[in-house]
């Protein structure tokens, strides 16, 4: 559920979650000896070679990207990123959430008061 007026915060939180998920997947895929692609099997037609070539191309792309971003996967750099992200985007979320809860409570009470007949709901009850 998105809080009114906090869509940019929700989007930044979603991007952060996707980034963390990508980090976890990349760390899990990395084995102790690195990734090695199996040797391609002989194929009967040239079209059957396409999936193998695509897989080989993607594995090399992922490996090169992982190697060039190795500094980012380290715990020190990632911890610094998380701390900066929290300070920039999530640090004052508690005060925003409290303000939203108070405004929602007031709005809900006003709607309930409007629906309540005058004979059942006296002014002294709501004060």
From Swiss-Prot:
Keywords: Lipid transport, Secreted, Signal, Transport
First and last residue of the signal peptide: 1-27
Subcellular location: Secreted
InterPro entries reported in the protein's UniProt record: APOC4
GO BP term, example: lipid transport
A Gene Ontology cellular-component term: very-low-density lipoprotein particle
Family assignment from sequence similarity: Belongs to the apolipoprotein C4 family.
Function: May participate in lipoprotein metabolism.
The protein's name: Apolipoprotein C-IV
Organism: Tursiops truncatus
């Amino acid at each position: 559920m998105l809080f009114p007026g906090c869509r940019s915060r929700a989007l930044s939180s979603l991007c952060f979650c996707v980034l963390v998920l990508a980090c976890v997947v990349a760390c899990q895929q990395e084995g102790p000896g690195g990734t090695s692609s199996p040797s391609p099997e002989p194929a009967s037609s040239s079209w059957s070679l396409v999936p193998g070539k695509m897989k080989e191309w993607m594995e090399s792309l992922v490996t090169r990207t992982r190697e060039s971003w190795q500094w980012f996967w380290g715990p020190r750099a990632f911890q610094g990123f998380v701390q900066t992200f929290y300070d920039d985007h999530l640090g004052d979320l508690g005060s925003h959430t409290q303000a939203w809860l108070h405004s929602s409570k007031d709005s809900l009470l006003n709607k309930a008061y409007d629906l309540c007949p005058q004979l059942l709901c006296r002014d002294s009850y709501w004060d």
